[in-house]
Amino acid sequence: MMAEPEFTATGVRIGKRLRSLTRAGEVRISDGRLRLLTSYGSEIDSAPVQAVRASRPWFAPEGRASADLNGTRYSLTLGDRDPAPGQPGPPSARRFIEAVRRASGRGG
């Protein structure tokens, strides 16, 4: 039985360097792993969440985060704030970074 994901965000733009990999992908933390998925659900990359570095580039807009997986840096465009309950759209970049820290046991 699969555990409920600790964090899931849909509608996330995922890029690598200057290339967009998917405009409406999914970021999911479950079973101790962070997965980056395309809008069709195929895996772009995944890594144990302890090995992932998630941060907010200081010069980037509020909704942006970066995630380093397996030596590759991905740029993630989430929301600049959490959507209202029942509203579509990805959660905030800050919530993603907190979720990575919490899931990897680095405090929350």
What are these regions (language model features)?
Residues 1-28, 88-107:
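Anionic N-terminal interaction surfaces
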Residues 13-14, 38-40, 67-71:
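Short acidic, glycine-rich loop/turn motifs
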Residues 17-62:
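Phosphoinositide-binding peripheral membrane targeting modules
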Residues 46-108:
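Acidic, Ser/Thr- and proline-rich intrinsically disordered linker/docking segments
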